[in-house]
């Protein structure tokens, strides 16, 4: 299936786009085997200042640029004789008009998610079933910010030779996660008397995640550049910062088992045990064990 959504935001220069594509397939070659496959892709694009960045929106348009009513004139700017009460050069108090403020504080974010899962089930015997699952998740987040010559960022946080000149920053996050699980399940119904029912399952799961973070900053664009020009003609600026960080691989391995027992299909008992080992913890503390027991009675 496919769906697409476009939304025009209330704030000028801001809009939102989202598209989703998904596919699912189940196939049984014979009575003993089954194949399952599903995939999903989504892409979201948000333009304009109506969003927050990873730094807590510190570079967004100041609220004073929009809250003009809060700063409305509370008294006449004229004296009784009709002359100005204030110096004309200071009337605006350094504030930019809202349209300029929006255009000079422009953000563009593109998020992509890709998910793919596959499974194979094999009924080795009528009471013995094997299943393996494989999954892949890909996440990309590309955030770009343009600060024009009227912004605080351009006027105060740039190199001296690029003061009051437009700049851009870009943050890219890429994450890949691979998952695999294998389970073996046995049903003892044919072995035990009919008043008893017992099902055992054992399994193993592994998850590996890798992530990178890249940040760049380009200053010194010509003063007439807008966001679109700066994003597409980045060679006209001067790179002042470029960092790329590779996070340590995040790995987790799990072993688990479960037993389901019932007597007369009325008295129920379930016991599970799971052991998880994670690379996030130091050696000697990487393994955790999680047993549980549950009982039930059908009245």
Where are these regions (language model features)?
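Transmembrane beta-strand segments that form the barrel wall of outer-membrane beta-barrel proteins
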Residues: 2-8, 269-281, 299
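Active-site-proximal loop/short-helix segments
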Residues: 138, 275-277, 289
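Residues on the lipid-exposed face of transmembrane beta-strands in outer-membrane beta-barrel proteins
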Residues: 23-27, 116-122, 182-186, 257-261, ...
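Short glycine/threonine-rich loop-to-helix capping motif typified by GTGT followed
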Residues: 283-288
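Transmembrane beta-barrel architecture of outer membranes
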Residues: 16-22, 254, 290
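Surface-exposed loop/interface segments of Gram-negative outer-membrane beta-barrel transport/assembly proteins
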Residues: 9-10, 14, 24-113, 133, ...
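Short, contiguous hydrophobic alpha-helices characteristic of membrane insertion segments
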Residues: 257-272
């Amino acid at each position: 299936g496919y769906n697409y959504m476009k939304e025009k935001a209330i704030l000028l220069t801001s809009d939102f786009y989202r598209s989703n594509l998904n596919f699912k397939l189940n196939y049984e070659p014979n009575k003993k085997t089954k194949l399952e496959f599903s995939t999903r892709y989504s892409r979201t694009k948000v333009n304009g200042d109506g969003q927050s960045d990873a730094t807590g929106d510190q570079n967004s348009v100041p609220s004073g640029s929009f809250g003009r009513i809060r700063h409305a004139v509370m008294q006449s700017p004229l004296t009784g004789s009709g002359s100005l009460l204030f110096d004309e050069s200071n009337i605006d108090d350094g504030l930019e008009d809202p349209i300029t403020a929006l255009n000079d504080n422009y953000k563009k974010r593109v998020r992509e998610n890709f998910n793919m899962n596959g499974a194979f089930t094999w009924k080795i015997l009528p009471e013995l079933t094997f299943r393996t699952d494989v999954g892949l998740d890909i996440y990309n987040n590309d955030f770009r910010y343009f600060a024009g010559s009227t912004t605080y960022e351009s006027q105060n946080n740039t190199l001296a030779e690029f003061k009051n000149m437009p700049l851009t920053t870009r943050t890219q996050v890429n994450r890949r996660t691979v998952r695999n699980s294998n389970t073996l399940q046995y049903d003892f119904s044919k072995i035990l008397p009919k008043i008893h029912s017992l099902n055992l399952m054992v399994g193993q799961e592994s998850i590996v995640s890798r992530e990178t973070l890249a940040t760049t900053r380009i200053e010194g664009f010509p003063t007439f550049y807008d966001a679109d020009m700066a994003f597409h003609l980045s060679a006209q600026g001067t790179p002042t910062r470029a960092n790329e960080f590779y996070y340590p691989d995040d790995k987790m391995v799990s072993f688990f088992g479960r037993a389901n027992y019932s007597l007369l299909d009325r008295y129920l008992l379930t016991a599970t045990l799971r052991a998880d080992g994670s690379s996030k913890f130091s050696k000697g503390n990487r393994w955790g064990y999680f047993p549980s027991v549950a009982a039930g009675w059908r009245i």
